[in-house]
Amino acid sequence: MNIKDVGVIIAKKPLKENTFIITVFTKNHGLYSGVVKESSKKSKFIYQEGNIVDFLWQARLHEHIGMAKCELIKSYTGYFIINKAKLYAFNSVISLIKELFHEREEHSNFFSFLINYLDNLSKNFCFRDYINFELALLAETGYKLDLTKCGVTHVTTDLNYVSPKSARALSYEVGKPYKDKLLILPKFLLSDDSEITLEEKRQASTLTNYFFNRYLFHNNRQAEARQIFMEYILNNS
């Protein structure tokens, strides 16, 4: 059987000399892995993590790993490799997708979101965009945070906390008596115009990390690339 789609290469593992297993996050078919052969310098350039490719997958049976071929559509390598913030953000993004999405599970809407994020990242690193990516990823995996209004009073102003149980925002007055048990809602997530302080970056990292750990990273397993990214950002801001 054959699968044809457009996708982003998110992983590449050596199998034997000049032969690799790549994992591609495709628009209409989710994650697909296949064996590729690098027979030329051109093919080595094509099979790089982050490249957007036309993807062809072939196998006798659907459950087989299959053989893959790709044609390059766009490469982001040159944009990311010269900037550590961009590179670490990119590594974190593809690592999270690889960790949290199941093989051959469709995520077509999120694919479009990813392409838009990579395009923006290639132009400029923005911490707000990165955290919004993580929030979108949580929503895509079934754990959407409602940060638009207070989960108790439904007011949309003076939001200050997030409930770890309901994943909903809480106003300052509602949350104050329980503040030691709540997560802080970073102010920059409520306004696109606000400056982002170092403390707000820590708060944002803690916020999304809590829900990743509670619902998605089982047995204390975490995405190492995300840890590297966050450590870099928090130590260089």
UniProtKB/Swiss-Prot annotation:
Pfam families: RecO_C, RecO_N. GO terms for biological process: DNA recombination; double-strand break repair. GO terms for cellular component: bacterial nucleoid. Gene3D superfamilies: Nucleic acid-binding proteins, Recombination protein O, C-terminal domain. The keyword DNA damage applies. It comes from the Bacteria. Transmembrane segments: none annotated. Keywords: DNA damage, DNA recombination, DNA repair. SUPFAM superfamilies: ArfGap/RecO-like zinc finger (SSF57863), Nucleic acid-binding proteins (SSF50249). NCBIfam families: reco (TIGR00613). Involved in DNA repair and RecF pathway recombination. Belongs to the RecO family. This is DNA repair protein RecO.
